[in-house]
Amino acid sequence: MGETLAQKIICAHLLHGDMTPGSEIALRIDQTLTQDATGTMAYLEFETMGIPRVRTELSVAYVDHNTLQSGFENADDHRYLQTVAKKHGVWFSRPGNGICHQVQLERFGKPGRTLIGSDSHTPTGGGIGMLAFGAGGMDVAVAMGGGAYYITMPKMFKVNLTGTLRPYVTAKDISLELLRILSVKGGVGAIIEWGGPGIAALSVPERATITNMGTELGATTSIFPSDDVTRAFLAAEGREADFIPLASDPDAQYDRVIDIDLNTLQPMIACPHSPDNVVPVETLAGTKVDQVCIGSCTNSSLFDMLKVAALLKGRTIAPGVSLSISPGSKQVLTMLADCGALTDILASGARLLECACGPCIGMGFSPNSGGVSLRTFNRNFLGRSGTKDAQVYLVSPETAVAAALTGTITDPQTLGPMPAVTLPEHFRIDDSAVLPPAPADEADAVEVLRGPNIQPFPQSRPFADTLTAELVLKVGDNITTDHIMPAGAKILPYRSNIPKLSEFCFTVCDPTFPARARAAGDGIIVGGSNYGQGSSREHAALVPMYLGIRCVVAKSFARIHAANLINAGILPLTFENPADYDALQPGARLRIDGIRAGMAAGKLTLTDTAAGKAYSVVCSLTERQQAILLAGGLLNYTKEHAL
């Protein structure tokens, strides 16, 4: 039996384990990336390991999230990242150089390599044929130190594309259509491979849009073959030597195959407040729009921006609409300026923002109260934009432009003929904003600079054999890491300061949570299905750990968050009978006995001591994960088992 493309790359990087779906495997990692919102903690963790220099082929530290610098905290973090990167063998992408996934794709991504990043949209690299995973910062720190990256061997899904996209129908619409089919939970435990005759007409930026939004499906990662399209992109970036052809075997077997006919696809839109709440754009035509944002790691490539400029040329945005443009990288912005496209964008009335994440994470450009905002982003969770009552929709750049021009949600196919847009054969190459690390023989002399907001990494506690704790919070289904640890301009500056950050934990759900969790001493959280979906931010585990949370019991967990809980020393458990969720109420005193033996057996008993009721919970942990929890988290475990 033949192998899928993902199986081939996994096999080439397999250090331990059996490639049977559901079993734990350990992978050798070639490249890592961090961004500044999660990177400061990742490098603090790396420093505690005492390893002088990274052991990957390539590691890059990006600054693209906390770029407002409204106080000293962001600037101090950037200075810390620049100096710690220089000292330990990491390349540093300066603020303004671009969004990590866009720059990584342009300048560093290589087909067939493995990549993990402390950002959940790291699978963007699958657009160039990489096996790329989002992960918590602790896992990235271990990989930088030469350690393996552990995952559960995924199932293999295949999406076959046939036909050709019609004008105004885009890669974003393909992503939204798959979300409509599968939901935000439909890709959990799977790698999604894209193939079929329809992929031949998709450029690397379009493919990267699709693999980027595989994260919203809950997929482990997504990947395209490396083919002539890939070669052309690498050649345009002056990196054709990095090209290798990669494809699945003709007789490869998949656990599920999904067919999408591009000929019948139409412009799609994800309605508030979930990326899978998808309908055709035409069904919402006429809805008033207040704001349009074009950019993010999903839709900020040169190809996207050239299409936006072509549609805006000679036109003016509607008086009641505010339009922002965030190019994905300095390369994109410079080339837009070179060809005159930037002038067309600005002449339309658009506002040019920095080459950064910006509005996607609530870092500026928040909508008006109750406003309707159309965004080319990948998430529209409640409050993520920075405005709690805003209605955020996810669309393609073409649909975004149509709304900006008309002032209402509009099917872009009504705009007339789509202007022809082609990518140049060669892109402008300027890597001056990517700073190299110090040579190994000069690294000792580099001083790592730390501002007063950068606090030491919090210490977790090993597990005793019995846990007695208060149920301090009960939440529902699809709780995101934005619910657990909000982002935005007011909170992100404290990502290096866990004590300060803890003041905001779960306040979206319950403003009293931080104080009650501290008062409880040891605490337990109960959640519904898909607990912890969304961003890979490990702060959504580290901060609850700091507040005394020892265990989370849920109907099911998102993959990255479950790993982050274990890394932080928090025990993730699932209900054997999901109906037991309804019986547990906040304030209950809960006890778990025989933790060590129960971990090994895969089942524990959760007892409500006042009610005298016992509930069976499942403990799906590998031996390694059990050892991590018993040690009090991954850093303690790593120190005990030197890399």
Spans of features found by a protein language model:
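Fe-S-dependent hydro-lyases/dehydratases of central metabolism
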Residues: 1-643
